[in-house]
């Protein structure tokens, strides 16, 4: 049995699930999800209001009752070892080589935002992250627009909300300015020509005021509290031909789940503003990076739009 602790929003929970799914697949073990942290059960204390958000997918894994996880993690008798061995991700997203040697009966705690942790189980993860039909049906009209577009479609994600209003999150992640999106779109346009933008955001007013939008572009907004709507938005992202990401695990997954073999994915560099965080393995090597620190009068260098090495 592999048990993974869930925390954060949809994108974070997906990384946690994917890492646990890969470890379980290596050992032919069952994957169990511990939602006690986000539920606030069993004495767990979360600093943010979250909930279990993986219900939008057709998952076979189950969410364990907090009492069961508690029994597995601790020994009833002092002389007995806990049933599960705990493995915690190193601080600041540092690589965890112990994960590759982890055995069955392991409890995973961390964010695990590293594609190498589950690349050997990619087929399992993609199959598991199949959206339920009712999720896809929520935005069927927008999905039709994406499919009927005569020019390539681009999913562009803008995240503001907590990145602006929460000092801790703002200091760690930082916000992306209009110049990043402008340079990303210029780089895309130089390779594929005219495109139609589908902008997904928690701040539509900011997007309309700060992004270069045409009449044919679509801006679709949702508040952070609308979890079901965000799930349908991620599903829409997967339908687009190309992707411009925010520094958010949400749009990371929207791009990664896209089945297009010719997709171009643009991600900001650095991903996390706090330089203590390790970025090795966070961005797939075939994706491209645009520096987020450009000013409006500083065009990108010739080496900016290049594969990550």
Predicted segment positions?
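N-terminal pre-catalytic "stem/leader" segment of glycosyltransferase-like enzymes
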Residues: 1-42
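Leloir-type glycosyltransferase catalytic cores
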Residues: 273-297
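Short, aromatic/basic amphipathic alpha-helical patches
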Residues: 43-57, 207-216, 277-284
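Donor-binding and catalytic core of enzymes assembling or modifying cell-surface/extracellular glycoconjugates
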Residues: 186-276
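Short, solvent-exposed loop/turn segments at secondary-structure junctions
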Residues: 9-11, 37-40, 112-116, 159-163, ...
């Amino acid at each position: 049995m592999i048990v993974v602790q869930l925390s954060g929003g949809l994108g974070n929970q997906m990384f946690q699930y994917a890492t646990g799914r890969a470890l379980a697949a290596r050992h032919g073990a069952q994957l169990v999800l511990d939602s006690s942290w986000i539920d606030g059960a069993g004495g767990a204390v979360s600093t943010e209001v979250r909930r279990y958000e993986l219900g939008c997918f057709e998952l076979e894994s189950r969410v364990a009752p907090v009492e069961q996880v508690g029994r597995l993690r601790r020994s009833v008798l002092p002389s007995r070892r806990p049933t599960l061995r705990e493995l915690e991700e190193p601080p600041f997203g540092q690589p965890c080589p112990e994960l590759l040697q982890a055995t069955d009966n392991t409890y995973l705690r961390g964010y695990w935002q590293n594609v190498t942790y589950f690349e050997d189980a990619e087929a399992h993860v993609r199959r598991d992250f199949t959206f339920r039909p009712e999720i896809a049906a929520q935005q069927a009209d927008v999905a039709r627009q994406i499919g009927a577009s005569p020019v390539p479609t681009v999913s562009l994600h803008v995240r503001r909300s907590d990145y602006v209003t929460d000092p801790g999150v703002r200091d760690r992640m930082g916000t992306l300015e209009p110049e990043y999106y402008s340079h990303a779109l210029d780089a895309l346009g130089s390779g594929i020509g005219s495109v139609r933008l589908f902008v997904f955001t928690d701040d539509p007013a900011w997007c309309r005021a700060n992004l270069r939008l045409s009449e044919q572009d679509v801006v679709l907004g949702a508040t952070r509290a609308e979890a079901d709507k965000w799930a349908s938005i991620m599903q829409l992202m997967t339908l687009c031909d190309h992707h411009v990401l925010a520094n958010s695990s949400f749009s990371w997954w929207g791009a990664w789940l896209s089945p297009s073999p010719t997709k171009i994915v643009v991600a900001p560099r650095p991903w996390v503003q706090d330089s203590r965080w390790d970025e090795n393995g966070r961005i797939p090597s075939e994706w491209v990076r645009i520096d987020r620190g450009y000013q409006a009068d500083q065009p990108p260098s010739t080496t900016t739009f290049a594969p990550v090495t």
